[in-house]
């Protein structure tokens, strides 16, 4: 039984009486015995309640049974393991290699009434774990469970904070450390392997135990894929070969900031003129209210009827052409829902394009003092119709891009055209929404010219979402939901295969006592100058927040930092091209390039921008200096030219001079040195 088949030379399977071990390229993946089984199965009834994208999830667990007995046999492709407990409780595990040589584990409960799986993967106490999509509170996931379910990210996201308590009291919206728009059942271990689960059901990846990782799935089957590499860079190349990679960004992205403006054509023109006349480099105007405004108690929201509102934006079509001639793009907004009181929803309903309720009627979701229909993207005709809405109403208008928002709100009790349970489709929905946008660009020949950016994601978003943004941060300094949280979000996505990430400059969520300060906006601007894209947002209550044109000092700050950003254009373009070619992310954890430095594995608030720039954003209020860690190398402080060799260092960090270092040996060193004179 120990002899591997020719196509499984990287696998080592050893059986001893009623126990076995499975190694893959010298990594222990599974270990099983009667006393320590690797598999449990059971049955449960999901109790999932949604209110405005915030989910209460409970499992009415009926049984959970350890499968202690294992009978092993060889199959044409590898090994077959029949797990059981007694005569009528069993499951089958097929161990093989896929067509690319990856380890493939295919598990099926033999009784389909057993719709729960708990599989334990072997681990070492010293392992670090990264990934699971976009995680805002933790980068190293070891020591905690991470439920995987796409939803709103929460307001506060920390049950110990007052803001979270306030949001929970209002509409169960506070969230917790694991709430995310972009969960994905993919993780990377410091044993230099990745594990990806093909399923899209509700899952919980628990990394709490020292000797194993327990993966729980609310389904009767599971498919897992593993691949190993000698370096993390090579491992990410393999992971993105499986999941897909983002195309390169349009060239105009690197030419300045995208200004988030609302209020109409002339307001956009006036603010654009103000900023450009003061020397601000502007690449675009992003007007999310292009389709109209709906005022709610939450604040100013968009009218979800995806067509140009000529009352609010008169002569927008001709103005877009004018702005384009001046090197300024116009970006809009869309999401996969249609407001029930508008004509696009009526059109979709007439053609049967909306998801259904139990009685066969159109399922209308309450989105916050208004209702909307869910365009059923599993219906090929509805999918094609929505692509045409994008092509006709946005691309033909001349939009250079848009926010493709939402995707997390698919109710689990709706009925879909493809017949698959909405509970299973829920996590898959954001990638389906991304694919709809991607194909609209691909079919019009605009891929690489037009950019859409998303907050929600899942397996497949790596290929189909051209850019991610971090969603709705609070306009505050909190670690779990403020400026700081964007860095672990970007790094965890990087380790999940998506290498293009940015955030709303200044944050978004303006509730309770939170109001964006001038200092926060300027610090966020500093940080964003060292990301792949600079873009502002007014927030949900613009009048409460400090804005980019708040005073002359703020405008001058944007002029300087957009000059910094545009100066880095050739360097950023090269990093983005490498991401498209090999899956090496633009914003990188330090250990990708400093594997032997143990300290780099626990850093979550600093990153490498490309290979040669190290950034440690100031994320605390009132600071004038900052302490950070430099791995051993020849580093130069970007603003003073002072040389550093490595270790913990403290530097002056006034607003406008964030802690940024570059490698003295970089081929781009002369370009980086020029930042000092800006």
Swiss-Prot record:
Effect in UniProt of substituting residue 288 to E: 500-fold decrease in catalytic efficiency with PNPSQ as substrate. 100-fold decrease in catalytic efficiency with PNPSQ as substrate
Superkingdom: Bacteria
One Pfam short name: Gal_mutarotas_2
GO biological process: 6-sulfoquinovose(1-) catabolic process to glycerone phosphate and 3-sulfolactaldehyde; carbohydrate metabolic process
Induction: Induced during growth with sulfoquinovose.
Outcome after substituting residue 301 to K: Almost complete loss of catalytic activity
Outcome after substituting residue 405 to A/N: Loss of catalytic activity
Metabolic or biological pathway: Glycolipid metabolism
Active-site residues per Swiss-Prot or TrEMBL entry: 405, 408, 472
Binding site for a 6-sulfo-alpha-D-quinovosyldiacylglycerol: 288, 301-302, 304, 537
Catalytic activity: a 6-sulfo-alpha-D-quinovosyldiacylglycerol + H2O = 6-sulfo-alpha-D-quinovose + a 1,2-diacyl-sn-glycerol; 3-(6-sulfo-alpha-D-quinovosyl)glycerol + H2O = 6-sulfo-alpha-D-quinovose + glycerol
Outcome following mutation: residue 472 to A/N: Loss of catalytic activity
Regulation of catalytic or functional activity: Is inactivated in vitro by the mechanism-based inactivator 5-fluoro-beta-L-idopyranosyl fluoride (5FIdoF) that yields a covalent glycosyl-enzyme complex with the active site nucleophile Asp-405.
EC number of the protein: 3.2.1.199
Top enzyme class: hydrolase
Molecular function GO labels: carbohydrate binding; hydrolase activity, hydrolyzing O-glycosyl compounds; sulfoquinovosidase activity
Function: Catalyzes the hydrolysis of sulfoquinovosyl diacylglycerides (SQDG) to sulfoquinovose (SQ), which is then degraded by E.coli through the SQ Embden-Meyerhof-Parnas (SQ-EMP) sulfoglycolysis pathway as a source of carbon and sulfur. Therefore, is likely involved in the utilization of the sulfoquinovose headgroup found in ubiquitous plant sulfolipids. Is also able to hydrolyze simple sulfoquinovosides such as sulfoquinovosyl glycerol (SQGro).
NCBIfam families xref list: PRK10426.1 (NF007746)
Entry domain remark: Structural analysis revealed the molecular coevolution of catalytically important amino acid pairs directly involved in substrate recognition, as well as structurally important pairs distal to the active site.
Record-given protein name: Sulfoquinovosidase
């Amino acid at each position: 039984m120990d002899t591997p088949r020719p196509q499984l030379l990287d696998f080592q399977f050893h059986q001893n009486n009623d126990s076995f071990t499975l190694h893959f390229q010298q990594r222990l993946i599974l270990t099983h015995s009667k006393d320590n089984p690797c598999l449990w199965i059971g049955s449960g009834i999901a109790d999932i309640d949604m209110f405005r994208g915030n989910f209460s999830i409970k499992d009415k667990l009926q049984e959970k049974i350890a499968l202690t007995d294992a009978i092993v046999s060889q199959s044409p492709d590898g090994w077959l393991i029949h797990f059981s407990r007694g005569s009528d409780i069993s499951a089958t595990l097929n161990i093989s290699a896929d067509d690319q040589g990856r380890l493939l584990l295919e598990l099926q409960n033999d009784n389909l009434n057993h719709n729960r799986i708990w599989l334990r993967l072997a681990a070492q106490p010293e392992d670090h774990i990264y990934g699971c999509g976009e995680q805002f509170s933790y980068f190293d996931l070891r020591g905690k469970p991470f439920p995987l379910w796409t939803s709103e990210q929460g307001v506060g996201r920390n049950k110990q904070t007052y803001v979270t308590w306030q949001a929970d009291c209002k509409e169960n919206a506070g969230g917790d450390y694991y709430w995310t728009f972009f969960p994905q059942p993919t993780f990377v271990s410091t044993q230099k392997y990745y594990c990806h689960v093909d399923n899209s059901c509700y899952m919980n990846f628990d990394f709490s135990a020292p000797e194993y990782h327990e993966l729980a799935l609310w389904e009767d089957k599971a498919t897992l894929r593993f691949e190993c590499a000698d370096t993390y860079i090579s491992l990410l190349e393999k992971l993105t070969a499986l999941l897909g990679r983002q195309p390169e960004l349009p060239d105009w992205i690197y030419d300045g900031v995208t200004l988030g403006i609302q209020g109409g054509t002339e307001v956009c023109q006036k603010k654009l003129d103000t900023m450009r006349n003061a020397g601000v480099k502007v690449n675009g105007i992003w007007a999310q209210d292009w389709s109209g405004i709906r005022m709610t108690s939450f604040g100013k929201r968009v009218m979800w009827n995806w067509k140009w509102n000529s009352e609010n934006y008169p002569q927008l079509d001709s103005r877009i052409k004018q702005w384009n001639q001046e090197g300024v793009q116009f970006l809009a907004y869309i999401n996969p829902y249609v407001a029930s009181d508008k004509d696009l929803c009526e059109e979709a309903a007439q053609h049967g394009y909306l998801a259904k309720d139990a009685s066969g009627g159109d399922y209308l979701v309450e989105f916050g003092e208004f209702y909307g229909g869910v365009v059923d993207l599993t219906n090929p005709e509805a999918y094609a119709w929505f692509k045409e809405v994008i092509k006709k109403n946005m691309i033909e208008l001349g939009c250079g891009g848009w926010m493709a928002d939402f995707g997390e709100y698919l109710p689990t009790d709706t009925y879909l055209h493809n017949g698959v349970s909405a509970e299973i489709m829920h996590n898959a929905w954001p990638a389906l929404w991304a694919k709809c946008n991607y194909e609209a660009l691909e079919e019009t020949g605009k891929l690489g010219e037009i950019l859409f950016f998303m907050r929600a994601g899942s397996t497949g978003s790596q290929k189909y979402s051209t850019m991610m943004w971090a969603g709705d941060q609070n306009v505050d300094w909190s670690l779990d939901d403020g400026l700081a949280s964007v860095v672990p979000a970007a790094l965890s996505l990087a380790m999940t295969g998506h290498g293009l990430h940015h955030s709303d400059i200044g944050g978004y969520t303006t509730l309770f006592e939170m109001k964006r300060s001038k200092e926060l906006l300027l610090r966020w601007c500093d940080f964003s100058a060292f990301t792949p894209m600079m873009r502002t947002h007014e927030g949900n209550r613009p009048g409460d927040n400090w804005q980019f044109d708040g005073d002359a000092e703020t405008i001058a700050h944007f002029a300087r930092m957009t000059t910094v950003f545009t100066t880095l254009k050739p360097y950023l373009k090269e990093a983005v091209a490498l991401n498209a070619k090999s899956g090496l992310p633009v914003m990188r954890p330090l250990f990708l390039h400093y594997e032997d430095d143990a300290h780099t594995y626990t850093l979550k608030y600093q990153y490498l921008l490309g290979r040669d720039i190290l950034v440690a954003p100031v994320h605390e209020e009132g600071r004038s200096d900052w302490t950070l860690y430099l791995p051993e190398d020849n580093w130069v402080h970007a603003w003073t030219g002072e040389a550093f060799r490595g270790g913990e260092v403290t530097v002056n960090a006034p607003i406008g001079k964030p802690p940024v270092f570059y490698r003295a040996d970089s081929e781009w060193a002369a370009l980086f040195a020029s930042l000092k004179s800006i």
